[in-house]
C-alpha cells in the first residue's frame, strides 16, 4: 500500500532530531521513545522504492531535505576520525545502544569493542562497520538520483569508489570491519 508506506516514512521523520538523527524506537508514550541510537541508514532506499511504485515526485520533494540531513548526520556524528568511514554508536556512550544501532544487537563482532566520544551527545564504536558503510554508499547513489527528482542540488562527497576496497581483506578474500586505532581488520566472519 503506497500511501501507508509514505505515512510510515513521514512518521519516522517526524521524530528526526535537529542534528538529523532518526531515533530508534517511537512509542505511544513518548517517555518510552529510544533516543539513544539510530538504525542502519536505509531511508533513501525506502523512498526510492516508494517513488518507483508511485512516481510521486511531490513526496520525494517533501522528504528529500530530511533524507539528506540524515545522511550528513552519519558523517558528522558517527565518523570519529573523519576519514569518511562511519561507525555505529550512541548518544549516551553505551555499548549496548551502539549494538542496537547496528540492528545486530548481539553480534560477536562487537564483543571487544569500546566507545569513543565524538561530541557532547555523539559516541562511536572503535570500529568502522562494513555493512554501515555499504548502506551509506548505496544511500549516496540513491540520494543523487532522488536529488534530480526533487530538483535539489547534490554536492555530497562521493565515497562509493573507496568503500569496497577499504573493507576488503585480499588475503582472506572477505569484507571485515576495521579497527579505528590500527585500521586492521576485525577478524569475525558473519555476525
Identify what each model region corresponds to.
Residues 8, 63, 70, 157-160:
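Alpha-helical solenoid repeat scaffolds, predominantly canonical TPR units
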Residues 1-3, 62-68:
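Structured ligand/cofactor/substrate-binding pocket environments in proteins
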Residues 21-24, 41, 160-191:
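Extended hydrophobic/aromatic segments used for targeting, binding, or gating
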Residues 3, 54, 170:
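Residue-level signal for short amphipathic helical patches enriched in basic/charged
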Residues 19, 23-42, 48-52, 57-61, ...:
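The feature captures the catalytic groove of carbohydrate-active enzymes
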Residues 11-16, 153, 160-162:
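Active/binding-pocket-proximal capping segment
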Residues 1-16, 190-191:
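Alpha-helical support elements that line or immediately flank enzyme active sites
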Amino acid at each position: 500500500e503506497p500511501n501507508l508506506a509514505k505515512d510510515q516514512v513521514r512518521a519516522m521523520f517526524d521524530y528526526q532530531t535537529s542534528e538529523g538523527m532518526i531515533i530508534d524506537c517511537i512509542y505511544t508514550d513518548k517517555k518510552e521513545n529510544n533516543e539513544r541510537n539510530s538504525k542502519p541508514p536505509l531511508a533513501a532506499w525506502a523512498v526510492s522504492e516508494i517513488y518507483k511504485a508511485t512516481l510521486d515526485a511531490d513526496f520525494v520533494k517533501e522528504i528529500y531535505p530530511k533524507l539528506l540531513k540524515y545522511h550528513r548526520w552519519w558523517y558528522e556524528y558517527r565518523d570519529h576520525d573523519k576519514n569518511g568511514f562511519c561507525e555505529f554508536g550512541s548518544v549516551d556512550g553505551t555499548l549496548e545502544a551502539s549494538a542496537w544501532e547496528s540492528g545486530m544487537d548481539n553480534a560477536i563482532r562487537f564483543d571487544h569493542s569500546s566507545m569513543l566520544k565524538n561530541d557532547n551527545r555523539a559516541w562511536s564504536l572503535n570500529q568502522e562497520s562494513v555493512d554501515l558503510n555499504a548502506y551509506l554508499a548505496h544511500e549516496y547513489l540513491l540520494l543523487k538520483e532522488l536529488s534530480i527528482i526533487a530538483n535539489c542540488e547534490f554536492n555530497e562527497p562521493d565515497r562509493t569508489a573507496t568503500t569496497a576496497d577499504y573493507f576488503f581483506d585480499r588475503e582472506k578474500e572477505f569484507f571485515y570491519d576495521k579497527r579505528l586505532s590500527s585500521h586492521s581488520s576485525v577478524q569475525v566472519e558473519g555476525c
